[in-house]
């Protein structure tokens, strides 16, 4: 499990507005603190956010957060919930579960009234509010979460124990039974506002060190630090070896090998690609372009040069293409009839059977070096399918794979309702790909009556516009799809 400290500061952050103390003037990045928040990435890749601070947008850009599986809130104070509206770019099209006590959920409903009213304001985040009760464990993703009762002065709030890690912020007091529960922790995030001067609702650093000792001296990270805490470098000199001065961008990794504390390093893609929107282009011209890019990439590999990866998006005039293993009997009219309709048939080197390309369809041709991405051909095809599945989910459509057939389908397991929304057929040589996918956006589906699409006579074909009952902004859909490609392939 990875724990990334997105923010390590108290409610005012550091530097504090209007303050000129030496901590606020420090040029050490470790002394610059946004409001406290923690991102957990599970071994299965699920992402859980603890508290959503007013600095979430800045923190998310730093950490490359583009999806979350759940949000856990400790209490309703603004420095812990002020970033909830910024979740809109992550969950405007699918629900995100937010876990908190009932009084916190009520506060959120009041604060974000425009989100939860009968007719929500367009584009607001889809938040599913889930009640949590102290000492009643619940499941989030692949983890068991144990809520713990702690006191924030007179205000009862929650801490969270997740496996062998615990997160306690804004705590002043904790009961003996909760201390006992924490003794199995190997990693603890715990608040310490300032070194020694008493505060009515927060622990001091000295008190935090004492609490850590009561728990059994697990590896610990101090959080929710103010500008009255020591400078980071001075702090390192006075803290015991197992207690770390938290800072924005600290990462703690906990596994069977132990616990490692390090600087978080934002993910860098193994390989970028060049994107080219070819607009409306004849199929033959696009085929010539991809073949040139493909042969240039293969030649680069033969000369031990790094090939350039290219993603082409095209929109074609009506045309039919037949893969190298396709069956001409799946063309339901003669070539002379095709000619009379001014539709050309191309025999091409991709896999798959016969399909149609035409206006309103995004035809994508990735010329990618799969070795740069560290994947094989099967994983690549699954990645193409996943990109389409992720895109159409934005429109509320559930895309799925179908056993024994490539592409993306709707209702693949319901006889008589199965329909294909995206066809996939590729060629690969020396791990370089060409051809790709055809996604029906505003496509005239009558053309598919001329063929058994992809060799199937018992399955239908659909488009995004057919499913939603209205034409889509084609340019916007292309932009959204390219962003999905950039995210998914960039994560490899």
Curated annotation (Swiss-Prot):
Its EC number is 2.3.1.181. It is found in: Cytoplasm. Residues 1-255 are annotated as: Unknown. Pfam families: Lactamase_B_2 (PF12706), LplA-B_cat (PF21948). Residues 256-492 are annotated as: LipB domain. One of its GO terms (molecular function) is lipoyl(octanoyl) transferase activity. Substrate binds at residues 350-357, 423-425, 436-438. This is Octanoyltransferase. The lineage of its organism: Bacteria, Pseudomonadati, Bacteroidota, Bacteroidia, Bacteroidales. The gene is lipB.
């Amino acid at each position: 499990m990875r724990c990334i400290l997105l923010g390590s500061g108290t409610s005012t952050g550091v530097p504090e507005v209007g303050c000129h103390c030496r901590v606020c003037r420090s040029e050490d990045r470790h002394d610059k603190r946004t409001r406290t928040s923690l991102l957990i990435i599970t071994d299965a890749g699920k992402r859980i956010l603890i508290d959503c601070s007013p600095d979430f947008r800045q923190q998310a850009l730093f950490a490359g957060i583009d999806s979350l599986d759940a949000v856990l809130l400790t209490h309703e104070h603004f420095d812990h919930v002020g970033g909830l509206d910024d979740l809109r770019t992550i969950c405007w099209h699918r629900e995100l579960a937010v876990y908190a006590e009932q009084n916190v959920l009520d506060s959120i409903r009041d604060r974000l009234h425009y989100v939860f009213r009968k007719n929500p304001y367009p584009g607001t985040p889809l938040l599913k509010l889930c009640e949590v009760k102290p000492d009643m464990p619940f499941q989030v993703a692949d983890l068991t979460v144990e809520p713990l009762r702690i006191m924030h002065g007179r205000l009862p709030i929650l801490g969270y124990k997740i496996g062998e890690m615990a997160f306690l912020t804004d705590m002043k007091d904790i009961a003996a039974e909760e201390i006992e529960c924490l003794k199995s922790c190997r990693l603890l995030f715990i608040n310490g506002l300032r070194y020694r001067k008493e505060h009515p609702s927060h622990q001091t650093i000295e008190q935090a060190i004492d609490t850590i000792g009561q728990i059994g001296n697990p590896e610990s990270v101090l959080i929710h630090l103010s500008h009255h805490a020591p400078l980071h470098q001075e702090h390192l000199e006075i803290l015991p070896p197992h207690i770390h001065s938290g800072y924005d961008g600290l990462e703690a990794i906990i596994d069977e090998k132990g616990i490692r504390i390090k600087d978080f390093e934002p993910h860098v893609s193994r390989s970028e690609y060049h994107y080219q929107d070819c607009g409306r282009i004849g199929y033959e011209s696009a085929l010539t372009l991809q073949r040139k890019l493909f042969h240039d990439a293969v030649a680069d590999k033969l000369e031990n040069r790094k090939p350039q990866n290219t993603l082409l998006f095209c929109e074609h005039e009506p045309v039919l293409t037949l893969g190298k293993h396709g069956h001409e009997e799946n063309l339901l009219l003669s070539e002379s009839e095709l000619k009379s309709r001014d539709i050309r048939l191309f025999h091409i080197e991709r896999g798959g059977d016969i399909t149609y390309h035409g206006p309103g369809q995004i035809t994508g041709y990735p010329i990618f070096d799969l070795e740069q991405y560290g994947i094989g051909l099967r994983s690549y095809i699954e990645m193409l399918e996943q990109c389409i599945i992720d895109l159409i989910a934005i429109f509320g459509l559930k895309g799925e794979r179908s056993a024994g057939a490539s592409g993306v389908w709707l209702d693949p397991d319901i006889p008589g309702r199965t329909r294909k929304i995206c066809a996939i057929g590729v060629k690969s040589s020396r791990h370089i790909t060409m051809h790709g996918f055809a996604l029906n956006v505003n496509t005239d589906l009558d053309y598919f009556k001329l063929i058994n699409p992809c060799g199937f006579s018992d399955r239908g074909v659909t488009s995004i516009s057919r499913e939603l009952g209205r034409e889509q902004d084609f340019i916007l859909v292309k932009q959204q799809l390219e962003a999905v490609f950039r995210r998914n392939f960039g994560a490899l």
